[in-house]
Amino acid sequence: MIWAALTVTFYSITAYGDKYISAKLTCTPEEYTFFVSLVTVFWLALCLPFTGWRLGMDRYCIFFLVCLVVWKVLEFYTTAILLRHMEPYELKAWLGINMILSYGINLWEGKSSFRVSILILALCLLTGIWLILTDKKRASGGMGKYIAVCLLYIVSKFMYGLQMGKMARYGNSVSILILVLLIVALIQLPRLPRRKLPAGKEMTGVILSRLTNAAGLMTEAEAAASNIFFYTLIQPLQLFVLFVACLITGRPMSRKKRAGSILCVAAVLLSSMALL
């Protein structure tokens, strides 16, 4: 359980670090993608003496690497855009849809049986997301464009996870991540706007947020190896922790948004436990 608890802690800190980079430093999607990728590579490289470098190359591996780069760029861009207008827990609530999608794929492949309870919880999750979306403070602006970016975020996360699983036969996760994120960072170089880049305390915040991300990647692997039950609960527990943190810090929240948020958190937690 300790590994899962550490992972939730590290990833929750990272989520606020992402919010800091995107909203506080007002980084463009290109800047956000570059900083997040490059600094994460730095911390992951320090882990190589413990994990080793293992990555076999053939044409299928190269194809999957290209796909991972595409999905990771899309994930970072959408994250940078969304975190300017939403709290970190809201972003995690959207990821609950991926859990339902995974369940649907397992149904299609005959790996799971149909459960009415999961369908009800999926409807609760979608209802909660809709309540948050239609909150009066978010009503102004292009709702359609906002939803489109959220859906792109979900697709990028889902496809990245799916193809990362297929890459496991070619090497360890640290080696794959270093190569993918390094390519992502290099792609952003020509696209970086010409302005003064973060430095001093601002850059320290960026570096520390990636340290917790790298640490979370390590403890997540340990959690998966030690206890699959607690590993499965990492995502819903992180959503719960981020929501509680939002309440404790007194972030403005209407009754409608609060109700939708509680519905999302409950639906994701119960769905995770039901699918074990």
Locate the predicted segments by residue.
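Structural signature of hydrophobic alpha-helical transmembrane segments
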Residues: M1-Y11, G56-W71, K111-T127, L151, ...
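Alpha-helical transmembrane segments of compact multi-pass small-molecule transporters, enriched
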Residues: V39-W43, W94-E109, I183-I187, A215-T219, ...
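Loop-to-transmembrane-helix transition segments
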Residues: M1-T7, F35, A45-L48, R54-T78, ...
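Membrane-interface helix termini and inter-helical loops of multi-pass transporters
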Residues: L48-Y60, L107-V116, R138, G161-S175, ...
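Hydrophobic transmembrane alpha-helices of multi-pass small-molecule transport proteins
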Residues: V41-L44, I97, L101-L107, V116-D135, ...
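C-terminal ends of transmembrane helices
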Residues: T14-L25, V73-E90, I129-S140, I187-P198, ...
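Structural motif at transmembrane-helix junctions in multi-pass transporters
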Residues: K24-E31, Y77-W94, K111-S113, A168-S175, ...
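Glycine-/small-residue-enriched transmembrane alpha-helix faces in small-molecule transporters
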Residues: M1-E30, I120-L121, T127, A139-V174, ...
